[in-house]
């Protein structure tokens, strides 16, 4: 668990609630409702036939029994199940712009959750590192939502790595009916050539669920300033090395690697029609989420 006291944790959760609930009510509720559809049409009632009704909806049993034409009425089955796949690996603690990825992930998760609750949808979450660390089954209600936010802030992973494939496989197996899923991560889970390691799991998951990717990153992590000889350590692998940051070729190669990773992941998401938005920790995430909702 985190080092926050119970009182500090409560204050932080409350602060996030006040900020994100207002955003959800004022900005996102309508966009969310339009962007994410229900599972289809569900039977509502039987009523007397009216001129213009589709004869394909005639209820012939009721018509025969009452000796008057009756039709079946259908309504959109609006209620969704929303699942947040939250990357809780060590890299989420990185932050040089006043906020860590952990902070921004919590706020984005809260906005999505409040938007869902406003629309009477269920919300659940599972946290992953290189394994699924915790699963919170989908439910409705403010207290459940605040439980999810508190867990995101407080949770500490038992391992250090990242395995997006494991998270996607768990989604496919644990949630049997189609859900609306949001994958929140820095998306750095790649092979040596920069290609995503999770293509097969992604392919299976999107056949069952409506998946969107929200990449949260710190731009300062993806470029190295010229500050001479420095000691760096990977928060997930634990490996460390001395690096001469005055070497222009090294800095350029480092930036090119991240650029290649981004291009390959974007290409993969386009291949499987997965909506993706990238949000920097020092950017306004409201704009990013609006873009995600409006582009659907």
Where are the predicted features?
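An amphipathic, basic-hydrophobic helix/alpha-beta surface used to engage anionic
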Residues: 1-139, 180, 184-185, 192, ...
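Short amphipathic alpha-helical interaction patches enriched in hydrophobic/aromatic residues
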Residues: 92, 96, 152-156, 273-276
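Well-ordered alpha-helical segments embedded in enzymatic catalytic cores
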Residues: 108, 166-170, 261
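Short, electropositive alpha-helical surface patch
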Residues: 135-151, 294-295
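Von Willebrand factor
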Residues: 144-179, 191-192, 218-219
């Amino acid at each position: 668990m985190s080092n926050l006291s119970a009182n500090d944790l409560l204050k932080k959760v409350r602060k996030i609630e006040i900020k994100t609930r207002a955003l959800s009510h004022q900005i996102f509720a309508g966009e969310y409702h339009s962007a994410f559809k229900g599972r289809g049409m569900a039977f509502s009632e039987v009523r007397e036939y009216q001129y213009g009704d589709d004869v394909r909806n005639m209820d012939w049993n009721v018509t025969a029994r009452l000796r008057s034409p009756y039709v079946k009425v259908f309504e959109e089955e609006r209620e969704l199940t929303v699942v947040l796949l939250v990357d809780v690996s060590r890299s989420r603690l990185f932050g040089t712009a006043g906020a860590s990825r952990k902070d921004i992930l919590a706020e984005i998760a809260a906005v999505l959750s409040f938007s869902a609750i406003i629309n009477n949808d269920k919300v659940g979450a599972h946290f992953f590192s290189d394994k699924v660390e915790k699963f919170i089954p989908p439910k409705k209600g403010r207290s459940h939502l605040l439980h999810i936010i508190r867990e995101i802030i407080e949770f500490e992973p038992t391992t250090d790595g990242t395995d997006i494939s494991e998270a996607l496989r768990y989604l496919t197996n644990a949630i049997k009916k189609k859900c609306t899923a949001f994958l929140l991560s820095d998306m750095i889970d790649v092979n040596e050539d920069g290609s995503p390691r999770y293509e097969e799991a992604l392919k299976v998951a999107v056949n069952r669920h409506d998946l969107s990717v929200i990449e949260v990153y710190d731009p300062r992590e993806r470029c190295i300033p010229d500050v001479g000889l420095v000691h760096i350590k990977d928060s997930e692998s634990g490996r460390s090395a001395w690096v001469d940051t005055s070497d222009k070729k090294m800095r350029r190669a480092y930036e090119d690697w991240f650029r290649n990773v981004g291009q390959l992941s974007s290409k993969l998401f386009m291949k499987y029609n997965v909506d993706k938005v990238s949000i920097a920790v020092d950017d306004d995430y409201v704009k990013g989420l609006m873009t995600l909702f409006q582009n659907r």
